[in-house]
Amino acid sequence: VVTEAAGSDRAGKITTAAAAVVLDADGKLADVMLDELELSVSGESTGSVTTPEDVRSKRTKGEDYPLAAASSLGKGWAEQADWFADYLTGRTPDEVKKLKTDENGKSQDADLVSGCTIAVDRYRDAVVRACEQAKALGAAQGDRATLSLIAADLPQDLAATDDQDAHVQADITLAALTVDSNGRVTSAIGDMTQPQLTVSADGTVSGPEEPVYTKNEQGD
């Protein structure tokens, strides 16, 4: 999981990229599934705060996230993310870590961009982090990775005052599973991340100075 919470002037965004992975006996990626959640927050000069009502992930939104119409490939987000996941399959975590991207987070590799032109830097980093945290929990050869990324509804009536800032916290729950050819769950792990943006009385939105870690990463 890679989470960023940042603000600029009166606009802020929380972005969480997540990956579920299966590693084979040689430590190479046997399966990868990706998802991403983006939540935009804005502030007004009066201190009022606007938060999104739709808190679904990109994969969950499906055609409601209309990337295909704007894509030169005519592919939606899930199609491109799955292409990237397939591109990573068979590689080691170290090989994934070395995948180069440009200043916009996009790859220049011809094989990859033939089916995926979206920025992949956060997904690459999420896969690397997932590999670093991977544990033997019961998955077997041939099992597939699945991923669920769910955010709780955000408050719709927040406002900052001269005496008190407004805090927008996203409670994001993640579950990574492996399933066998019969659709049975063979392993599972859950996690949670709680990134937060702060809105001041003049509407300025700011993010935390420190990196955002999940509950599992924070440990005890």
Stretches with model-predicted labels:
Residues V2-D220:
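Active-site- and interface-proximal helix/loop "cap" or "latch" segments in soluble metabolic
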